[in-house]
Amino acid sequence: MSNRVIIFDTTLRDGEQALAASLSVKEKLQIAMALERLGVDVMEVGFPVSSPGDFESVQTIARTIKNSRVCALSRALEKDIDAAAQALSVAEQFRIHTFISTSTIHVESKLKRSFDQVLEMAVGAVKYARRFTDDVEFSCEDAGRTPIDNLCRMVEAAILAGARTINIPDTVGYTVPSEFGNIIQTLFNRVPNIDQAVISVHCHDDLGLSVANSITAVQHGARQIECTINGIGERAGNCSLEEIAMILATRKGMLGLETGINAKEIHRTSNLVSQLCNMPVQANKAIVGANAFTHSSGIHQDGMLKAQNTYEIMTPESIGLNRNNLNMTSRSGRHVIKHRMEEMGYSEHDYNMDALYEEFLKLADKKGQVFDYDLEALAFMEAQAEEDNHYQLQQLVVQSDSTEGVATATVRIEVGGEIKTEAATGNGPVDAAYNAIARATDRRIDIISYKLGAKGVGQNALGQVDITAVYHEQNFHGVGLATDVVEASARALVHVMNLTCRADKVADYKQSMQKNRELGGV
């Protein structure tokens, strides 16, 4: 049996289900390209039949990604498989992933069928998917609670029908490692054709055991692990990719297994997903948390000064985190900035050097020193600015009366190429800025979530504001970064307004298409 573990990333499918607002096609593509740099073997990027937006994003990613296999999900229904095959047809290499529930509670309560009927549906779905590709994965949903006799029957039948990967999900995160390992071992002992497929696992974290269950599974013969960046996903989340990758790398001598993951891309990819998904990483998160390589105890610090491996089983550099952040000033030349971006893993194709350097100089004049995390934040802001924005914030001036609590904000904003200036008051500077922007744009949205964070540490940190807003019964997520919290809030609002503007254009286009169809049918 091979010692190579296939890494199947489902951040853009299972992970996205946890988000308050869906990612845009451009944001999904950014993450997909980061996953490709990271070296994932397979990336599951959506559920094409679920919506036109999901279909478009799967197709766009399938057209772009070259080095990873692109996968789409489908139920055990022909219409789902057709949609997945159509969206994936432009890919260099693709996989169709079809699934059906197999546990007694799901079969009887959700599907309202007999197990034999469900088995027949599964076989039919796999055979149908094989018409489009040889690479078909079949999942036994809620396998962790499926009677073992039924699970063995289902796995054998799916392999016989043509599935080349069989996924065993612990859908509700119910099993413990010894129990889950026994399930995998039993399949290897009792399914006669199991050597004709790769056994995969997909563990959820409801009891905090997703990573432990996945490691136990590969010790018993599984050779694919399904996971997400930062462990994001429904409810308590999924198995964390970065934890799996670093466990297998750090304990290779004991486990004897390896992956194709480029570990130096882990930190960068984690940051990107956290930023775009508006899901901060907890400080004590293994591998990528802010405190993962922090040593506060005097005894620990003394040991670290004598020998790093006294208290570090891996280095921050191994995941692409530079231990010694080089501070830069307004006197730093373009070559310094380019060099630092390269050291952090960014190629010149990932950002606009002219725009980045211009923003760097502005920030350096304000802060004095600029750090690595600042550059990453500026590159993210610059990428946002390159989008086709109807609204662009030019200037924000705020005056606040600390005794009365009333603030006045004046904004200059470009609206479709026209400069508008408006002023408004509010209950505090952020409220005043929001009111002024709403007046200038003549667009009202309802903010349902406002989160204030920091990019960096100490007094030199950049303010990061994440907002979720409702517009026409849809949720939109905006991010703003600036040295000033009020400006960051204003930028986040403008970001959301641009997203709603694009949504209006899409709605108008769909309405126009519908009218054309109706006229054509008369």
From Swiss-Prot:
One of its GO terms (molecular function) is acetyl-CoA C-acetyltransferase activity. Pfam families: HCS_D2 (PF22617), HMGL-like (PF00682), LeuA_dimer (PF08502). Its cofactor is Mn(2+). One of its GO terms (cellular component) is cytosol. InterPro entries: 2-IPM_HCS-like, 2-isopropylmalate_synth_dimer, AIPM/Hcit_synth_CS, Aldolase_TIM, LeuA/HCS_post-cat, LeuA_allosteric_dom_sf, LeuA_bact_synth, PYR_CT. Its EC number is 2.3.3.13. It is an enzyme of class 2 (transferase). GO terms for biological process: L-leucine biosynthetic process. It catalyses: 3-methyl-2-oxobutanoate + acetyl-CoA + H2O = (2S)-2-isopropylmalate + CoA + H(+). Residues 392-522 are annotated as: Regulatory domain. Gene3D superfamilies: 1.10.238.260, 3.30.160.270, Aldolase class I. Mn(2+) binds at D14, H202, H204, N238. Residues 5-267 form the Pyruvate carboxyltransferase domain. Its main location: cytoplasm. Keywords: Amino-acid biosynthesis, Branched-chain amino acid biosynthesis, Cytoplasm, Leucine biosynthesis, Manganese, Metal-binding, Transferase. Pathway: Amino-acid biosynthesis; L-leucine biosynthesis; L-leucine from 3-methyl-2-oxobutanoate: step 1/4. It is found in: Cytoplasm. Catalyzes the condensation of the acetyl group of acetyl-CoA with 3-methyl-2-oxobutanoate (2-ketoisovalerate) to form 3-carboxy-3-hydroxy-4-methylpentanoate (2-isopropylmalate). Belongs to the alpha-IPM synthase/homocitrate synthase family. LeuA type 1 subfamily. Homodimer. HAMAP family: LeuA_type1. This is 2-isopropylmalate synthase. It comes from Shewanella baltica (strain OS185). The gene is leuA.
